Amino acid sequence: MTVRNSSRPIARVFRATVAPGCRDELLRKFHSSSAALVNSKKGCLKYRILEPVDASALEVVFESVWQDLHAVKEAFGDGWEQSYLPEGYSVLMTACSVHHFLVSENSTTK
């Protein structure tokens, strides 16, 4: 992978396919442990938890926005390109992924 080392903000998008019957528990963990984890790291600007409009859909998203790529690497270490799963998360999902995006300079927070 060719990584652009940029000073622009980085969105870290964690997507999970929820295991049957585990959606509420995974969302609780997002609101507690995932939120606490990113809030404890230097360089995290904000986070948000996204649920699908379709209540029967099995995907949920935890998105965090970081000051820059250096902040992401500092927070997650050598495994920054991989999903970080705290204890107890893996049994709540059948699949997950993490992707990183440069935040557009024209993005707004309205």
Regions found by a protein language model. Give the residues of each.
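An amphipathic, aromatic/His-enriched active-site/gating alpha helix that lines ligand/cofactor pockets
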Residues: 5, 36-44, 65-100
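Residues within well-ordered alpha-helical secondary structure of globular protein domains
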Residues: 29-32, 78
